[in-house]
């Protein structure tokens, strides 16, 4: 793949084979962000699990302490008082049967989906539309719940969802390049703690095999998964 001059210069500014402390990797990623837009800071983790086995599927959510820097558009499938509660909590789109039909027809102008338990019998038919996009509501991630107001507030406040893919990789964001180094580091630490907590009992050997952090258009910097998770304390000179 042909890389831009900016990308090549950024890739040459650090040792691609070195395993950096999380905060050091974040600093490099921020420095490599030269685009005119506010790039997202992404993390990819390669896990020592077999996603083909149900008991090794790693999936969860975490509330990032400093949010994501993005305003998520939240859709809620609910009726009556639950629908009103969702609207009051800031849901962007709320509805029942008609909204289900609209989504089934291909409308996908939203970033997250929440549903009340009584709606799931009907929402279930959207599996082929929402599932491949990681948008299908699920009790395990708190998106199938009677407390739709809390679910909406959590998502709007910076809650992210992650799920291991068929190659055993986890992808998630920890904020924007405009965030301070410590903000990004603390978001990273929160996500890492949750991934570690979700380690399957049947997973043998090394659980986290590789971690990289990068901006949207920047090169990946390898992070040492064994370094301290209290990343904000790694460098007293870090920018908050």
From Swiss-Prot:
One example of a Gene Ontology biological process annotation: regulation of translation
Molecular functions (GO terms): rRNA binding; structural constituent of ribosome; tRNA binding
Assigned keywords, A-Z: Repressor, Ribonucleoprotein, Ribosomal protein, RNA-binding, rRNA-binding, Translation regulation, tRNA-binding
Record flagged with keyword Endoplasmic reticulum: no
Domain of life where this protein originates: Bacteria
Annotated InterPro entries: Ribosom_uL1_bac-type, Ribosomal_uL1, Ribosomal_uL1-like, Ribosomal_uL1/biogenesis, Ribosomal_uL1_3-a/b-sand, Ribosomal_uL1_CS
Gene3D superfamilies documented for this protein: 3.30.190.20, 3.40.50.790
GO CC terms, sorted: large ribosomal subunit
UniProt cross-references to PANTHER family, sorted A to Z: 54S RIBOSOMAL PROTEIN L1, MITOCHONDRIAL (PTHR36427), LARGE RIBOSOMAL SUBUNIT PROTEIN UL1M (PTHR36427:SF3)
Assembly and oligomerization: Part of the 50S ribosomal subunit.
Family statement drawn from the similarity comment of this UniProt entry: Belongs to the universal ribosomal protein uL1 family.
Protein task: Binds directly to 23S rRNA. The L1 stalk is quite mobile in the ribosome, and is involved in E site tRNA release. Protein L1 is also a translational repressor protein, it controls the translation of the L11 operon by binding to its mRNA.
HAMAP family linked: Ribosomal_uL1_B
Protein name as annotated: Large ribosomal subunit protein uL1
GN (gene name): rplA
């Amino acid at each position: 793949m042909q890389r831009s001059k900016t990308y090549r210069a950024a890739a040459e500014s650090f040792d691609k084979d070195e395993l950096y402390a999380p905060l050091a990797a974040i600093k490099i990623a921020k420095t490599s962000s030269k685009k005119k837009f506010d790039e997202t800071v992404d993390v990819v983790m390669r896990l020592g699990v077999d996603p083909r086995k149900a008991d090794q599927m790693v999936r969860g959510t975490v509330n990032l302490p400093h949010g994501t820097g993005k305003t998520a558009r939240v859709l809620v499938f609910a009726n009556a008082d639950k629908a009103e509660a969702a609207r009051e909590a800031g849901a962007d789109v709320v509805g029942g049967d008609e909204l289900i039909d609209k989504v089934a027809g291909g409308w996908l102008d939203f970033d997250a989906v929440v549903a009340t338990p009584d709606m799931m019998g009907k929402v279930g038919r959207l599996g082929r539309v929402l599932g491949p996009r990681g948008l299908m509501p699920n009790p395990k991630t708190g998106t199938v719940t009677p407390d739709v107001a809390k679910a909406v507030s959590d998502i709007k406040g910076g809650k992210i969802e992650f799920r291991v893919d068929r190659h055993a990789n986890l992808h998630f964001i920890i904020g924007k390049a405009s965030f301070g180094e410590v903000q990004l580091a603390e978001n990273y630490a929160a996500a890492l703690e949750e991934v570690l907590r979700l380690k399957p009992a049947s997973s043998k050997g090394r659980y986290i095999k590789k971690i990289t952090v990068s901006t949207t258009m920047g090169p990946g910097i390898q992070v040492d998964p064994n370094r301290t998770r209290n990343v904000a304390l790694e460098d007293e000179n870090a920018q908050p």
